[in-house]
Regions:
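Metal-dependent nuclease catalytic cores that hydrolyze phosphodiester bonds in DNA/RNA
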Residues: 1-129
């Protein structure tokens, strides 16, 4: 089990959507998320080329499947870090469990402590995010 280290105090924040963009209200600031900033500043040439190559329908199917798999992985790994049991008996759940177990074996085995899970972090006046 990974121990929670109470070194930092985190300020709570509220996530909200504004015109399709993720934002946070935290410590009196209304801030764009890191995801929103990266989305607006990235070069999406490769992505557009990939969609053209795959076709819109197939690209959307792959994007959706990847997002669902990522959410499942996040849930499994978050519960592991928090020392909670979690089991998803669906086919996808069993697939992501095997993937998550590899991440735990290789990436989390040497980790003995963590400072926060799904906490809001921000830089006053610039951006916020949850990690």
């Amino acid at each position: 089990m990974i121990k929670k280290l109470d070194k930092y105090t985190y300020v709570g924040g509220t996530r909200y959507m504004d015109n399709g963009s993720r934002n946070y209200e935290v410590a009196g600031y209304r801030l764009p998320s890191v995801t929103t900033i990266l989305g607006r500043t990235k070069d999406d040439t490769f992505l557009k080329d990939w969609i053209k190559k795959k076709g819109k329908k197939e690209a959307e199917r792959i994007k959706t499947a990847s997002a669902v798999r990522g959410t499942s992985m996040n849930k499994y790994l978050e519960n592991y870090v928090l020392g909670k049991g979690y089991e998803d008996l669906t086919e996808l759940g069993q697939e992501t469990k095997r993937m998550a177990e590899k991440v735990i074996e290789v990436g989390l085995a040497p980790v003995s402590g963590y400072f926060g899970s799904e906490v809001t972090l921000y830089y006053p006046g610039l951006y916020a995010g949850q990690t």
